């Protein structure tokens, strides 16, 4: 298992070791000891999974303190473009984002720490997306930023006319309207 630092501090790409033969493959998708030695102490409290069709875009979501969440995300089947936006005021990468292609084939994972907005777009016919979170979901602390904000300039790998976004995500505030609750 490799833990790869990215250009945004505290965000990591994780590449598991995959052992395959004619029967299929085996991989260790999470190891607490290795994770904590390489990244940070963590206590995941919930695993979630979603299935989406091509063009679905979920995001950009986060939860405000005290229910802010770190996430460990992966694509079990299909192909997604996963995005994390730094919301930590005072961070040298505040307002910047990282995009990583996660696929059922490459088995990569992305660790998104607290203080980031997160989203993904589905690039394949369908995709199964799984993620761990380190804090409970709380609807009253649920928040987000508009996925197509020109200040963020995120290329989601889709044409705008093929994007399917929830009604809730269509009315999220733009970056210029956003007041971050996070500090670096």
Where are the regions a protein language model picked out?
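Conserved SET/PR-domain catalytic core that frames the SAM/AdoMet-binding pocket
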Residues: 103-120
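Ligand-binding loop in jelly-roll beta-barrel domains
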Residues: 115-131
């Amino acid at each position: 298992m490799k833990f790869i630092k990215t250009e945004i501090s505290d965000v990591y790409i994780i590449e598991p070791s995959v052992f395959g033969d004619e029967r299929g493959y085996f991989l260790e998708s999470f190891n607490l000891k290795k994770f904590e030695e390489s990244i940070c102490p963590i206590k995941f409290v919930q695993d979630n999974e979603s299935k989406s069709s091509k063009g679905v875009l979920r995001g950009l979501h986060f939860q405000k303190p005290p229910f802010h969440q770190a996430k460990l995300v992966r694509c079990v089947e299909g192909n997604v473009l996963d995005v994390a936006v730094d919301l930590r005021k005072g961070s040298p990468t505040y307002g910047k984002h990282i995009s990583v292609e996660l696929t059922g084939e490459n088995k990569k994972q992305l660790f998104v720490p607290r203080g980031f907005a997160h989203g993904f777009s589905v690039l394949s016919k369908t995709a199964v997306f799984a993620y761990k979170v380190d804090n409970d979901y709380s609807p009253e602390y649920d928040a987000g930023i508009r996925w197509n904000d020109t200040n963020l300039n995120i290329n989601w790998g889709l044409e705008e006319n093929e994007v399917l976004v929830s009604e809730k995500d269509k009315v999220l505030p733009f970056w210029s309207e956003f007041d971050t609750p996070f500090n670096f």
